Amino acid sequence: GVIRHQDIQHGRAEGIGNPVIYVGAATGKDGIHGATFASEELNEESEAKRPAVQVGDPFMGKLVLEACLELFQCGAVISVQDMGAAGLTCSSTEMAEKGGNGMELNLDLVPQRAMDMSPYEIMLSESQERMLLVAKDGREEEVFQICRKWDVPASVVGHVISEPVLRLMHNGLSVAELPLDKLLGSCPIYERKAVASELQLSRQQQNAVDWDLPEDLGALLKEMIIVPELASKQWIYGQYDSMVRTCTSVGPGSDAAVIRIDGTEKALAMSIDGNSRYVQLDPKTGSCIAVAEASRNVVCSGGNPLALTNGLNFGNPEKPEIFWQLREAVAGICVACESLELPV
């Protein structure tokens, strides 16, 4: 969506003593280590790790979204952050660090939908549809009233403290107290081995000039255009309504989609591009080409490329060959972005 600059909400835990409020679905045992699971190889033994997969609730997500939008307008909320990867651990530490303060949480007050959850499980659960707020002291009831209106659970689970630490209480005892700089700024950086595989090197040494052309190029063309990666994608995007909210100027099938911004004379041009075969042959060059292609498509639609985000999906980075591919792809994106002066 599109938001106004004055409506942007920040994730800074400010104001010593201000309450930390948990908003959204109860915490369960689903999603524990979900972020790390996303980078693991899947095999026959992966079935045992199904609890690492988060259980979504789209309806609750919509209620949380609407409740948060109203909360931001009432003036009682100072900051907000979603509970994404690492759940409460990530949201609480990042908010406290960005605010230049610390945070104390009472895990007994965290809404839970599973019995006998340990502090470890509560802090690392990645259950969906949850937000962490810092509200102005004394205005908690305003937050609760709005949450009740939208039938969204809410509970004060802690407060902002002056010490730069994350302090956790459970069953009346302090079970953890960690300095924020050790969790965030001073955390160790991986130094992994990166090696191009023999298969990768052999692919790069192949020369298309040495290949024999088939006698019937027409038959070859027919074979190529039925390959899903090369064929028209109309059969997919034609099943979806591309005119939702009636802001679409240029729909799917063009170089880039163009969406009007209501109330202005501006529009957004967006393109998603990438050629897996190029990246497979040469991750660095292939990634450069992907950025350049997306930029050209935006330009050909009348736009000016402003920024991009990546959709990198690789295998297990603990394998030297896989890490080499990832490293080279990032380097390729970097080269293209520096050349085109595009922030990532």
PLM regions and their residue ranges:
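Glycine/proline-enriched, intrinsically flexible loops and inter-domain linkers
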Residues: G1-P343
